[in-house]
Amino acid sequence: MCLAIPSKVVEIKDNNMAVVDTLGVSREASLDLLNESVNIGDWVLLHIGYVMSKIDEESARESLRLYEQILQSMQEEENERIEANK
């Protein structure tokens, strides 16, 4: 199973690279696998350093909301596990 994370394009660089914001973290990503142009402000799906496709903002925000719920749930489970082992 592969996960692609919604990310917002914040800068277009030379050599077919972009800087994207992924959950508040900026990183460089390759545009080599994308068959369409991207602009600053576009939402894309990022997988292992490659932009896979463009997506609309509504889909991106919904996916990010679900990721945040998953992360929160995982953190709560970890906290419960730590408390149980004290």
Curated annotation (Swiss-Prot):
InterPro entries cross-referenced by the UniProt entry: Hydgase_assmbl_chp_CS, Hydrogenase_HupF/HypC
Effect of disrupting the coding gene: Strains missing this gene do not produce hydrogenase; addition of Ni(2+) to cell cultures does not compensate this loss of function. Interestingly higher than usual urease activity was produced in this strain; this effect was increased by increasing amount of Ni(2+) in cell cultures.
Disulfide bonds: none
Tree of life domain: Bacteria
UniProt cross-references to Pfam families, sorted A to Z: HupF_HypC
Any GO molecular function: iron ion binding
Pathway annotation from the record: Protein modification; [NiFe] hydrogenase maturation
SUPFAM superfamilies per the UniProt record, alphabetical: HupF/HypC-like
BP GO annotations: protein maturation
Matches recorded under NCBIfam families: hypC_hupF
Family classification: Belongs to the HupF/HypC family.
Task performed by this protein: Involved in the maturation of [NiFe] hydrogenases. Involved in the biosynthesis of the Fe(CN)(2)CO cofactor.
Name listed for the protein in its UniProt record: Hydrogenase maturation factor HypC
Gene source species: Helicobacter hepaticus (strain ATCC 51449 / 3B1)
Taxonomic lineage from the root: Bacteria, Pseudomonadati, Campylobacterota, Epsilonproteobacteria, Campylobacterales
Gene (UniProt): hypC
